Amino acid sequence: MSGRAKKTSGKAKARLNGIEIETCTAPEFNLSTKDVKLFLNELKKYMKLFKSAFVRVEQIQKSLTYLHGLLGNATRKNVEQIALGQKEKVRSLQYFVGQSQWETERVIAIHQGLIGETLGEEDGVALIDESSAVKQGTESVGVAAQYCGSVGKIANGQVGVYLGYASRKGYSLIKGKLFMPDPWFAEEHTEQRQACGVPQDLVFKTKPEIGLELLKSAIQRDNLSFSWVAADAL
């Protein structure tokens, strides 16, 4: 299966979307203040590539604030801690992440296109696999006692299914979706689904079904070439 990679001259702009095997060296953790300032400027330029996905200008700034938090040194990466660390109003950032209207699919399409520009090859490989995060509580969306590959056993946690891409030029993630265990769709979980903002029309899907959806969506975007699909057990 293959989509087409459109040829453009924007290769340099796309480098943040993946790891280029021949050009990237292992980080030495010796960044100077000047390096960090330059990085922040480059991140602003990079975010402008996604401008068309947002309805309002302030959403671009909110997305940049959120990215700063994810890339920062905070031990916890939830919205509240990110907002406090970035001196942003907590409710304002929570609204942006969870409720404000912006085009998620457009963000992914731009991201995938940039991967195609930098890493795309006709015989590239689409990769499907799952990843997990162990959780202590029961309030996180989709959390349940399930197999978590990160610890190699049944544990209380969240599991996501992910689509990646690899070629001789490098590799990158494209998109992921949270796996919602079947018990979460039971009537007794109605209040919890509502509290977590789970869409009312969401239905149970197996991990292979989610992986296939991710793959089909990537093909329909038609901006990344690959001839092979590889998947681990899901």
Question: Where are each of the predicted segments found?
Answer:
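Conserved, well-structured functional cores that handle cations and Mg-NTP chemistry
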Residues: 2, 20-234
